[in-house]
């Protein structure tokens, strides 16, 4: 770990007939309370060093990217500093997306009592005035729902990524599943429904329900759709490969061909029409390799590549709840009724690459898989540690093996929007050849 260190500063100025002593520190200079954060990110004690300077106010200048649960932690760290210094803390955070990182804003003022007295907007530029003369009440401004913060952050990340890469329009494949449905919602909010196109690519194994659900979702969002059936293309590949394979492709080869046919169609349309192709895979799939190189992994941005499947279900359930109405309206989405839809949220996950296929045919149930993945990835625990605390040994070793063997796919994956403490991409460096 690289420890960055800045000397605490003090700025003195005249205002309102009195002399003010403003303490100044940078971002993780606040992160010195190991009992709050779990680790000490700074050498020394930048907050303690400011105590001798007796500031009237501490200004913390941050460029702190979003991670789930981090908003509450920032408040706790700022409140701890305010209590030690006996003065308010003004926490000022950057807002905007920069590649994988999304800076979610949410600047605030916490009084010496620990109460949050001013809260600026999330995932949007904001400017407000705080009157230091007001008596700091002990009541605090509550945080928004965690799903509200997550939704706004993903929308901001997608919008800024597209804008900074020179794209106004986006394309995605719409399958009738929950992952592509969530990406469609995010794209409509980030770019406007008129700038989003969804392509349906049904195969002989696609259910009528998946097609109907996709079209209904697109209608609710107001996004354009197109349909290109892939049965004839599948037959063409079967014929072309029949002689060299001594028979048509079968099993996993045939399934991957379907995904690659779809990926090629999407890339061709995006290329011809000048659109940003959005990959719709989730973190669970990327972790265990339940995805196809040059197929469903195609895209310029993996919008939900840092969301586990269970998190996708949870966020979609919140989006469809009355609690999301204000957030949806603020993002330019319809405020009433379901967006994702119960039919999509409640269907068993399936890639529909063979008859009656379910994700659970190849993987543990996501309720089992995702906590294990989080322990292995974010918490950096070993299978031995998990087994010692009661995890089934065969399951822990199987999931660890899947995680290691999928590294070659992740190395070629599209960049994603980081919303956890440890995401795949630039913050994840593992060897490909250590998968045995």
What residues fall within each predicted segment?
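Enzyme catalytic cores with a strong preference for nitrogen-chemistry domains
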Residues: 1-173, 189-190, 225
């Amino acid at each position: 770990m690289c420890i960055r260190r800045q000397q605490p500063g003090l700025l003195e100025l005249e205002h309102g007939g009195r002399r003010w002593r403003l303490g100044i520190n940078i971002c993780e200079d606040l992160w010195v309370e190991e009992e709050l954060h779990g680790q000490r990110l700074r050498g020394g004690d930048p907050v303690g060093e400011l105590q001798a300077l007796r500031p009237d106010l501490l200004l913390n200048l941050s460029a702190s990217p979003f991670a789930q649960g981090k908003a509450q932690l920032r408040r706790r760290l700022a409140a701890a500093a305010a209590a030690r210094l006996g003065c308010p803390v003004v926490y000022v955070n950057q807002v905007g997306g920069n590649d994988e990182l999304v800076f979610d804003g949410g600047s605030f003022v916490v009084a010496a009592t620990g109460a949050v007295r001013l809260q600026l907007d999330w995932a949007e530029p904001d400017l407000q005035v705080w009157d230091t003369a007001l008596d700091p009440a002990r009541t605090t401004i509550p945080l928004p729902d965690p799903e509200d913060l997550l939704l706004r952050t993903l929308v901001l990340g997608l919008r800024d990524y597209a804008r900074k890469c020179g794209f106004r329009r986006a394309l995605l494949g719409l399958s009738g599943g929950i992952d592509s449905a969530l990406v469609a919602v995010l794209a409509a909010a980030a770019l406007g429904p008129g700038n989003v196109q969804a392509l349906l690519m049904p195969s002989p194994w696609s259910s009528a329900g998946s097609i109907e659900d996709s079209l209904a979702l697109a209608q609710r969002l107001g996004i354009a759709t197109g349909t290109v059936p892939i049965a004839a293309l599948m037959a063409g590949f079967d014929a072309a490969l029949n002689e060299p394979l001594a028979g048509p492709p079968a099993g996993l080869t045939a399934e991957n061909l379907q995904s690659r046919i779809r990926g090629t169609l999407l890339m061709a349309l995006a290329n011809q029409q000048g659109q940003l192709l959005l990959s719709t895979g989730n973190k669970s799939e990327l972790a265990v390799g339940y995805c196809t190189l040059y197929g469903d992994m195609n895209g310029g941005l993996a919008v939900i590549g840092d969301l586990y499947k269970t998190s996708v279900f949870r966020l979609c359930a919140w989006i469809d709840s009355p609690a999301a109405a204000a957030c949806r309206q603020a993002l330019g989405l319809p405020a009433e009724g379901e967006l994702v839809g119960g039919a999509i949220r409640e269907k068993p996950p399936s890639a529909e690459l063979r008859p009656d296929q379910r994700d659970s045919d190849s993987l543990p149930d996501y309720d089992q898989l995702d906590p294990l993945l989080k322990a292995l990835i974010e918490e950096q625990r070993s299978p031995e540690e998990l087994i010692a605390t009661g995890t089934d040994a065969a399951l822990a070793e199987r999931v660890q093996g899947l995680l290691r063997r999928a590294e070659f796919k992740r190395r070629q994956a599209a960049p994603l929007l980081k919303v956890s403490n440890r995401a795949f991409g630039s913050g994840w460096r593992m060897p490909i050849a250590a998968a045995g």
